[in-house]
Amino acid sequence: MPNNVTLHIPNLIKQIQADFPDITFEAGSHFSWHAKTRHVSYLPDADDPRSLWALLHELGHALLNHTDFSSDIELLNIEVAAWAEAHRLAEKYGITIDQNYIEDNLDSYRDWLHVRATCPTCYERSLQIDRQTYRCH
């Protein structure tokens, strides 16, 4: 496959569809993986390197069979795994993913997790009890 300069979303989609025919790709308003319907949504007009990286990241979720998560830390682990898979795919397709972009993306999850795990009363870290509830310890 060509490098980032000449590789465009439509070309990458065609190649990915040939390589992974069990996954459907649908134009949408954002990049996302839909486990129930086994399809990846993508921005059809996006044509920058970050869009290529996002597409590979969502494909990573698909190939790793990510469906759901039961805790916030599990979500973070799923995101890390999807980016690792995107890295592997990028090599296959001759794409270089900026590691700083990946870390910035993961930092947004880490920051979100930190806020959710901080008790609003005492500002100490708390423990997640279920998907929606944290308990101060």
Regions found by a protein language model. Give the residues of each.
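Substrate-binding clefts and substrate-entry loops adjacent to catalytic sites
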Residues: N65-E74
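Metalloprotease/metallohydrolase-associated module, dominated by Zn2+-dependent proteases
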Residues: I73-H137
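Histidine-centered divalent metal-coordination motifs
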Residues: H57, H61
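Alpha-helical scaffolds flanking conserved acidic
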Residues: P49-A54, N100
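Active-site scaffold of zinc-dependent metalloenzymes
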Residues: P2-T6, P10-S51, A62, H66
